[in-house]
Amino acid sequence: MVFRSSAAICGAAITLAVSVVMARSEIDRGHSNAVAKAASGAAIVGAASMYNPYRPGWQEGGPNTASGERYDPSAWAAAIQTSLRGKFGGVRYGASPKYALVEAAGKKAIVKINDVGPLTPGRIIDFNERTMRHFDPGLRLGVVYGVKVTPLSGDDWTPGPSDRRRGRVP
């Protein structure tokens, strides 16, 4: 009887130790597992930051996007996390950009996903300057948390602060 209870305690201790090690490894990978799990559903939720290769700083990405378009700070556009590029139409050179509905802070905007790779760890999306000003008008926050990004099917969306699809309201 003592042997069985000792074995049970030992088994529980080993299970706990393995769980702690696995949790630490997930944290060390920068939330990649959490993002991958969220990507299996229709929408992903996480944090957003801003990028602009024309502003000084270490986060310069260059004037061209992954789709081959030139970066335009006045467009309603964003860069999706590299590991999620398949969910958002591939985002590759020469391909038509895809669109997403972005919701945060009680606001919504349709953005063109034409680039990849938020350079800041832990972010799921990087907004260009115009999109970030929609969610953070004074650019004071730097990061917008609780951003919900839903891929939109089709390519007839009009980017901007609305839910309209070329005259049709979904």
Located regions from the model:
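N-terminal secretory signal peptides that target proteins for export/translocation
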Residues: 1-3
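Secreted/periplasmic proteins
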Residues: 5-10, 14, 18-170
